[in-house]
Amino acid sequence: MPLLFRRAPPGRPLTPGETGMARLVFGDAIDYAAVRVHARAYLPFGLQPPRTAMAPNGHLYFPRACCQDDFSCCDLGNRMWFIHEMTHVWQFQLGYPVRWRGALRIGLSYAYRLAAGKRLADFNMEAQGNLLADYFALRFCDGQHRLYEQRYRQMPGALALFETVLAEFIRTPSARRNLPGRRR
C-alpha cells in the first residue's frame, strides 16, 4: 500500500492517572475511553510547529519528542499542557467544531482576563484551554506560580476568582452552554 494511504498507528489510550487527572476538571463530561494519545503530528508534511500539540478530533496529537507515556507522572508544565489539550477534547465531545474553528481562526489568543460577571463561555477555545489548565494548577497542584496567565500568579484570592468565573462549568461540566460563544 502506498505510504500516503497507510493508516497511522492507533495511538494509546489514556492511562488511569491521566483519566483521574482530567476527571478532576471535567468530571464525567468526557468519554475518556474514546480518547487516544498519539506521539505524532496531526498535520501532514511538517505543517504542525515542532512543539505544538493538537486535539482537533477528540484525540491528542503531541509531537513525538513531547509525548509522554503518562502525563500524570510529569512535571506541572506537562500536566497543564495535557489539561489544555483535554479542554479541546471536551469541546469536541460536546459538539464544538474544534477542527474548523481552529482552521478558520488561526492565531486565536490564549490570553484571558477574569472578571465578575464573566463565565467560561465568554472565552475563545484556546483561552478556555489555558483558563482550565490554570484552574487545575491552582486548585489541585498548588501551582499558582506556574499559571499561564501571569497576572494571576501572585494575586491573593485568585482561586476564589477562578471559581466564581467557572461556577457554572464546575457545577455542570457536561453542559453545552459552557462552550465558547454560547449565550446565557
Indicate residue ranges for each PLM-predicted region.
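Metalloprotease/metallohydrolase-associated module, dominated by Zn2+-dependent proteases
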Residues: 2-7, 12-19, 23, 29-30, ...
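Short, solvent-exposed loop/turn segments at secondary-structure junctions
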Residues: 40-44, 60, 66-68, 87, ...
